[in-house]
Regions:
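Catalytic-site signature of metal-activated, phosphate-bearing donor transferases
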Residues: 1-87, 236
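Beta-propeller domains
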Residues: 239-557
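Structural motif corresponding to the intra-repeat A-B loop/turn of tetratricopeptide repeats
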Residues: 79, 116, 150, 199-200
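Start-of-helix register in tetratricopeptide repeats
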Residues: 67, 101-104, 137-138, 155, ...
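Single-residue signature of alpha-solenoid repeat helices
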Residues: 51, 85, 122, 156, ...
Length: 557
């Protein structure tokens, strides 16, 4: 402010700076100013009572001061004197003037009536505010929220549609008085994310709306609720399955003849599928635990009765198939031997993901290296097909977490890359010269970070990358941590040249089961179809075909 202009504060409280001389004004961003608030009256006792006294005394000599009436109404409202607040707001409306302040009077009258459990008058006042200033939608939001909570979903939705007509009508947010930005940013859409279930909005529409919410960096309660509601809107990929040239029934028989003490000692779980040297390699994880109806991990005795779990065991069975006249012919099956030096309560390599590169079969998996006080490493290595065993090392990264899982591989220009994290997309490289076939710890180095949408802070890796044309495709997963976990999935497509994220799909399930998981898929170029292997409830491995064009129709962006 220029010292040559006679500025002064005006008002008995909620003062503002003005001058009797001519002056110009402009907006400054919050980053350009700093307020040193000395002796802030708002932090002292009896603020509302003091403000009420000051404003009432001032109105005795200036009864038509619109600013005093407005802030007196606010003070009565904040002091829970709702009838007096309503009276002040109505007087302020009668004076006319600044439309922003008048709208707030209507909105606050509605809020006061709501506090007094008079919802009919509250709704009337909020509607009057909308009539006065239709781009201010906070009152309409309150109506939507009220009707949704009362189970009047169709009414709530019609008010939502009204709001959508004006949602983007605010010319400049900085010119709005006390704008409640969260209403416009996510609260309106959050309401319809709940309403959609009750009024049967198409799942694909609701799926996209939920993704938009998750991309807005919303509060945790909105994020958690949206994830929970996705169980109703997630697309069912099984409905998109098609018939392929190769019958897949043989894949469900993998490992049926493994040795075990009784029928329930081990059972098949999640498969990993991979094309390698024109053959199909499938590794099926066999485990000794089951998930009971309460979501707890148990073993089963010889009679199939649940028992407490004394140890978590994994056995990986690899089957090799070649193609003959559109048939899958099994040519070999074996249990993969591994370096067992870290076997403890947890035994075996969990979640092996196969990856073909330069005529060798690579893999990643999870190895628990310490228990109790759980510590896991990503085990990375090669599958020695002649000796039917792994040769591998444990991967380390700077600032490694005690529990590391779900790192996935892809290749480009004769190099292997590792995706460590999906938010930001963090791509690493491993110096292959350090690979010495011993289960020792080796470092990976971050190669590149790529900015991605906010939803990817929830994403974890599922499959290794599959090259399709000039792109690299993945399946990833998201977990909604509720009383019982719910798993969701997405396809993600990276540009092969710069690894930027080109697009990703709407959220789907494999067959609408609560716990689902995949470790791999393959792309059949001759059919333009993917073969996907997955498990449900850590059991029941299954496989199906999906056309690439049907997956493309599911893409979110």
């Amino acid at each position: 402010m220029k010292a040559s202009v006679n500025y002064f504060y005006k008002g008995v409280t909620h003062e503002f700076i003005t001058s009797t001389q001519k002056f110009s004004s402009d907006f400054l961003s919050k980053d350009e100013i700093k307020i040193n608030d000395v002796g802030n009256g708002g932090c002292k006792k009896n603020k509302y009572e003091r403000d009420i006294q000051l404003l009432e005394n001032a109105l005795k000599t200036d009864s038509k001061n619109d600013r005093y009436l407005f802030y007196l109404g606010n003070s009565y409202r904040d002091n829970n004197e709702y009838e007096k607040a309503i009276e002040c707001y109505k007087k302020r409306i009668q004076l006319g003037g600044w439309e922003q302040e008048i709208w707030h009077c209507y909105y606050n009258i509605g809020t006061c009536y709501k506090k007094n459990n008079n919802m009919s008058e509250a709704i009337n006042s909020w509607l009057d505010g909308f009539q006065h200033l239709p781009h201010r939608l906070e009152g309409i939001y309150e109506i939507i929220y009220y009707y949704r909570c009362k189970g009047k979903h169709l009414l709530a939705f019609h008010f939502y549609k009204m709001a959508q007509m004006h949602k983007d009508s605010i010319p400049n947010e900085d010119n709005e008085l006390f704008l409640m930005k969260d209403v416009y940013r996510f609260k309106l859409d959050y309401e319809v994310s709940i309403l959609g279930y009750y009024i049967n909005i198409e799942n694909s529409v609701m799926n996209r709306l939920c993704l938009e919410l998750l991309n807005k960096n919303v509060p945790s309660y909105v994020e958690n609720s949206t994830l929970s509601n996705l169980k109703f809107y997630a697309l069912n990929l099984k409905k998109e399955t098609s018939v392929g040239k190769l019958p897949l029934e043989n894949l469900t028989q993998i490992g049926k003849n493994i040795t075990k003490k009784h029928a329930f000692e081990y059972h098949p779980s999640t498969p990993s599928v991979c094309m390698h040297n024109n053959k199909l390699y499938v590794v099926v994880r066999f485990i000794n635990y089951y998930i009971d109806q309460e979501g707890k991990y148990k073993s089963k005795n010889i009679n199939g009765t649940y028992e407490p779990l004394s140890r978590v065991e994994t056995r990986n069975i690899c089957s090799v198939f070649h193609f003959d006249c559109n048939k899958l012919i099994k040519e070999d099956e074996f249990e993969i031997a591994y370096d067992n030096q870290f076997d403890c309560y947890y035994k075996g390599i969990e979640d092996m993901r196969l990856f073909s590169f330069k005529n060798e079969l690579y893999f990643t998996g999870t190895t628990i290296t310490k228990h109790p006080g759980l510590h896991t490493h990503i085990e990375y290595g090669k599958l020695d097909l002649e000796n039917k065993r792994t040769y591998s090392c444990l991967l380390n990264i700077e600032n490694k977490h005690p529990v590391e899982k779900n790192w996935v591989l892809f290749s480009n220009n004769d190099e292997i890359y590792i995706i460590y994290s999906w938010f930001p997309l963090t791509i690493c490289k491993f110096d292959e010269t350090l690979f010495d076939k011993k289960l020792c710890i080796r470092d990976v180095n971050i190669h590149k970070r790529v900015e991605v949408d906010n939803v990817f802070k929830l994403v974890r890796g599922s499959t290794n990358g599959v090259e399709i044309d000039d792109e690299i495709w993945f399946i990833v997963h998201i977990v909604s941590y509720e009383e019982k976990r719910h798993y969701y999935h997405m396809f993600v497509v990276l540009d092969k040249t710069d690894f930027s994220m080109k697009r990703y799909s709407c959220i789907f399930t494999f067959d609408k089961t609560r716990v689902e998981y995949t470790l791999g898929f393959v792309y059949k170029e001759d059919e333009k179809k993917c073969i996907i292997g997955y498990s449900t409830n850590d059991s029941n491995p299954n496989y199906y075909y999906v056309k690439k064009e049907d997956i493309e129709k599911m893409m979110y962006n």
